[in-house]
Amino acid sequence: MGLQLLTDRVRRVRRDNAEHRLSWLLRSRRLKGHRFHRQRAIGPFVVDFICVERALIIELVGAQHVLGLGPDAQRKQFLESLGYEVIRVWDSEVLSDPRAVLKKVLAHF
C-alpha cells in the first residue's frame, strides 16, 4: 500500500470518528432542544450537520482542507446565499475537546 493511500485512509477514519462523535453529541435534541440532521443534501452539496429550524450548518474540516480557499469557499458562499449560517469545526477539535465544540455551536443559538 502506497504512503498516499495509507495517509488518505487514516484521514478518512479520523473524519469518520469525528463525525460519529459529533453526531452523538448533537443527537436527541441536546442543544437547547434543536434537532440536527446528518449528511443532508442542499443543492449540489451534502452538508455534515444541519439544524433546519435555525438555518445552521456544521461542517467538519480535516487537515486536507484549507480554510477560505477553493471549493470550500464556493460551497460556503452558496449555502450562505440560501440563508444558512455555516460553522466550520476541525475534526481534531471534536475528538480532543468536544465541550469546546458544543460551546462554539451554542454560541450561534
Annotate the PLM regions.
Residues 26, 40, 89:
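Residue-level signal for inorganic ion chemistry
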Residues 23, 39-44:
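Short secondary-structure junction/hinge motifs that connect adjacent elements
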Residues 28, 39, 48-50:
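Short secondary-structure boundary/capping segments within folded domains
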Residues 1-35, 81, 109:
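Solvent-exposed, charged helical/coil patches
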Residues 11-15, 43-108:
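Basic, amphipathic alpha-helical patches used to engage nucleic acids or provide basic targeting signals
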